[in-house]
Structure formats: structure tokens, C-alpha cells
Amino acid sequence: MQRARARETRWANNRFAVPYPTDGPKITFGVLWFIGLVGAAALGAYADNATVSSVAVAAVASPIAGLAGLQTGNAWFPRQSATRGWTAAAAYLGAVAGLAGTWGVPIGFLLGLIVLIFYLMLYRGHNRPPLELFDVLARSALPVAVAVASLAALGSVGIGAQISLILLVSAYEAGDFVVGSGSSNAFEGPMAGLVSLGAVAFLLFLIQPAPFDDQSILLFAVVAGICCPLGQVLASALLPRGNDWAPALRRLDSYLLAAPIWLILALQLTAVE
């Protein structure tokens, strides 16, 4: 009880806290999320078609991006339901564009940007200055859109890379949640997550899925290990406070940096080959 109280106090007092709420079926949702993503990527592998993989992952993950845009928008605009609807639309459209492959990422970013600019032109009821308002709107919608679009587009570069990232991030999230939800400090969870990620990285090192070799898979695993905890902190920075309610954003937080950076590196890797 005392440990739980200390945990909640830390979350409340830290602007960039990464909370581990245990109420509700968190583990069930986490397992379903993992099955959905792996199943979508595996569908592309089974069909031996990168387009199928990108479309399937976008279909699974884009609604979560839209929900993250809605919940993050709600954290910033709790009394303005129209605003959070627009951030949800921008996040969803930006994310689903990833089904078009690598070009879908910048296209999705522009689509999300256009939606937000259109909203700014239509709605005049905010007290915030336009630039400040745009900053908050962009925070609510664009990072999750780019992350999901990048994850979907990664399948067009290499289905093996897409599945590898999903496995590494899922391992990190599982270890982080299991240990972090019972810890009174902010370090034990991420450390446990990195141990889990390292175990999966070792298996991938043995398998060496295309397009990786023994060196590149280790490099990509290290990048994922750096990006996962930083993505969680970035998610906190996107909210008014780190402990604000946005479970869909938290479902995607480890991908916020990992997916775009992996996509860029994977493009470089395949270009060299």
C-alpha cells in the first residue's frame, strides 16, 4: 500500500512521469494488441506481399492512433469535444496513409497537417494564441500518426524488419509493465524492459531475418532499446501532465521514436544492399 502511494505521488509530481495504471484489463488488451500486430505482419509474410503487410498493420494500428489523438486532445481540451474530434481525425488519416508504403509517411503527415490547419481556419472559439493552439493540436495528432504510418510502411521495406520491431517493442513493454507497475521508482520498469528486449534481440541475432545480418540486427536492437524508454517520456511531453489519462497514446508510446527511426535506417540498409 505504501509503495503504491509513493508511486502515485511520484506520477503526480513529475511532469514527465511514465505511469503504470493497473486498473482495468490492461494485460488482456496488451496481449490482443500484440496478437493483432503480429498477425497483421504475419499475413503479409504468408502472402509474401509487402503491400499486404503494410495494409494489414495500418488497419490494426490506425484506429489506435485515432483514439490516441482523441484522448490526447481530450487531455488538452476537456470542454471542447469538437476539437478532440479533429485531432482524432488528423491522427487517423496520418496513420492510415502508411498503407501506401514509405511515401505514405510524409503524405500522412501532410494530411494530418491539412486537417489541423483547416480546423484552425474554421474555429475561432479558443482563448489560446493561434501558434500555441497549433502546437497543442500538432502534439495531440501528428506524433502518433507518424509512428503508426512508419510501422505500417516498414513492411514495404522488409516484412522481417517490421515483425522484428514489433517483437522487440512488445518484449520491452511486457517487461517494463510487469516490473514497473510494482516498483516505487522510475528505473526498474525500463531496466526490466531492456532485459526482455535483449533476450528477443539475441533470438533475432540467431535467426537473422531479412534484411538483417549479424551486425545490423544488433544495431537495430540497440536503437530500439534507446528509443523505447525515450518514446515513453516523449508521450508524457505530449500531454499536459505525464499521468493524464490517454491509454491509447501509452499503447503507442514505445513506437513514437522507434518506428520512424527504424524506417529511416531500414531504407538506408536496403539501399546499401
Task: Please describe what each predicted stretch is.
Residues 1-4:
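Mixed-charge, low-complexity intrinsically disordered regions
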Residues 6-226:
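Membrane-embedded alpha-helical bundles of polytopic integral membrane proteins
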